[in-house]
């Protein structure tokens, strides 16, 4: 059996891998799977809204309702509201308590089941909860030491990623503002007409058709698209006789144009 020191080293190695993008589906899935393996339990990481950031279920509860929670990537609101009120690690919650993650209809199947909840903090804010559960066998002090280590590092990672995303959003907003401000009135009118022709964030347009539709020259559209592409707000590709393929890279463009009437 691995010693506490060996397990600590394993968890440290796992956490050093880090996470680079919170926007991807289940960004902490791989990490949670490896943590669950070291601690020997089922586990999941949720944010303060109850959305799953990662989970691992080596021990199946064989319950359709619980399986659906993980399929939907979200725990029940009632459970989440109770979980976010846990401010310090709560270990070995019995199976018949509200914070136990075991389904009520299956309590008799897991009489010795226990749940442990550990809050995740970063930069002084509550960012989520690390939840672990076992069908049999309480979490020991050694297990809880590993849990505290894991939640501390996850909290630092989450706060750093949130800061990076905030900075990236500010950068994109600034770039979108600057790009729109370089457009003349006619060019802005053209861009808004083009955006309305797209299917969401991408699509193909025919400049001459749009030019005739809003009463401007084709060159105005070409100049407007060139400015936006130079600013990294859109990308375009000629489709020959079919027109031009456009993709909006910076969705802040939509907000900058939304309040303008022509």
UniProtKB/Swiss-Prot annotation:
Keyword Cytoplasm among record annotations: yes
A GO BP annotation: negative regulation of DNA-templated transcription
Localisation per UniProt entry: Cytoplasm
DNA-binding region: 207-226
GAF domain: annotated span: 1-159
Keywords: Cytoplasm, DNA-binding, Repressor, Transcription, Transcription regulation
NCBIfam families: codY_Gpos (TIGR02787), PRK04158.1 (NF003170)
Role according to the record: DNA-binding global transcriptional regulator which is involved in the adaptive response to starvation and acts by directly or indirectly controlling the expression of numerous genes in response to nutrient availability. During rapid exponential growth, CodY is highly active and represses genes whose products allow adaptation to nutrient depletion.
Protein name: Global transcriptional regulator CodY
